[in-house]
Amino acid sequence: MEFVYLGTAAAEGWPALFCSCNACLQAREKGGRNVRGRSQALVDGELLLDLPADTFSRTLEGRLDLTAVRHCLITHSHSDHLYPADLEMRRTGFAHPADSRPFVLYGTKTAGREIRSVLKKYGLEQDGRVHFQPIRPFE
């Protein structure tokens, strides 16, 4: 099993988005390992843990190939772990997947409400591009 950390910071990221303390200024200046994105991980290249707003930047860095990811487990519905607006980019016209398998998200009812709102708005579940599967703790 391959487990890759894509982000290990808290909600504000590191350095913090609107912070100008000495630690954040130094982290910005040094870059590299001194900069951390919001929490996210990838298991065996196919299972994504969380979908934060940093997901797009991770694809640009070459650390994440979303065309290979089939499943995404949302640990909880806080905005640093779930940014459902990015699901719109799975729409016809934005995404041309190599196959027709859906991107399946798993999460609690709370996460499901946020995800389904986006899926409904863009017709993503009806066209089979994205599916939400509710789960309960310890299932």
Where in this protein do the model-derived segments appear?
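Binuclear metal-dependent hydrolase catalytic cores
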Residues: M1-E139
